[in-house]
Amino acid sequence: MKKILVLITLCLFASSPAMAETLQLLTWKGYAPKELVDKFEKETGITVEVTYSNNEEMIAKLRATRGAGFDLAQPSQDRISSVQAEFGLYQPVDYGKIDAALFIPSMLEAVKQNTLVAEKSYAVPFCWGTSGLVVNNAQAKGVTSWKALIDPQYKGRISYRLKRPVLIGLAFALDYDPFKHYGDEKGYAAMLEVLEAELIKAKPLVKNYWSNGDQLLESVRTGEVTVAEAWDNGAWKLHDENQAIDYVAPTEGALGWIDTFAIPAKAKNVEAAYKWINFIMQPENAALFTNAEKTPTASKDAGKFIDAAFQANFNRSFPQQVIDNIKWYPPVPANIEAMEGKVLDRIKAAN
């Protein structure tokens, strides 16, 4: 009988499939299109489980687990070095496992430098874009400045996220250079005091503080909001539906960001993470993402597969002088981010 049980057990193990591989991906909504997930799973046999998040939530989740629970995350490049230095949330990138030929060289190098901690780099680029304004030009003509977000003539039709872009954009509009103050805590605090007062005074002008892109798009689509802080890709989606709505890069400069791939410190399936990176950065796959999400990719040769509609949006919004005026986020020091968080909390709580 024992021999029979042993044989049955051996047969069961022999007939069972190998343990299925899983990639736990912590990312922004839209960054893992279903078509690409399905294609990756078919090609590799690796199941992709996606958790949607944003910069603040990614940091909070990874801090809570000390870098465990996920195999790959996608923070913005300016939000990596300070949290890595303080909390050790990520592991260094093994560039030997990255197909560097897939990336725009200057962007790959910039992210290497901007995520450098103790002579090791912690991310590679995925995509980039800007924060600026989405404007319904039929209802709010001539908007060109970040100051539109505190302009009484748009009372009840203004929206923005209570996050750092509105602080940074308004700072530039009020003739500060916030990035130059990163090393001057006292000067940065004085600037934040001015911004806090302006945004509290302007609270009665605000229709809502949006918290996700779909909420913003719907409020602009329905006409509830006519001027809002927004990402360029969301504005382009609305423009495709209604040409009166479009993206406006403020005259003080749109705010440029790069979202990345970073591998958490306690990732269980590191090899799957590198496979996903090299897969989604292949030109045709990267272009599929760009065409769907209207977000520029860091994939070097994706341009030949990007559709004409996206190219038209990009060319209309970003003539060369606008590109030259983009204010790119440098790595934000932890003390600066903490100061901003307290200011944003006070603005939210103010009556």
At which residue positions do the language-model features occur?
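Sec/Tat signal peptide C-region and signal peptidase I cleavage site
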Residues: 16-20
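Early extracytoplasmic/lumenal segment of secretory-pathway proteins
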Residues: 21-83, 217
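Extracytoplasmic ligand-binding site segments that recognize negatively charged/polar headgroups
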Residues: 74-217
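A ligand-binding cleft/hinge motif common to bilobed small-molecule-binding domains
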Residues: 79-82, 227-244
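A bilobed periplasmic-binding-protein/Venus flytrap-type ligand-binding module shared by bacterial periplasmic
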Residues: 132-139, 171-173, 258-269, 288-292
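Periplasmic-binding protein-like
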Residues: 192-202, 241-265
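Mature extracytoplasmic/periplasmic domains
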Residues: 255, 264-324
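Conserved C-terminal helix/tail region of periplasmic/extracytoplasmic solute-binding proteins
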Residues: 320-351
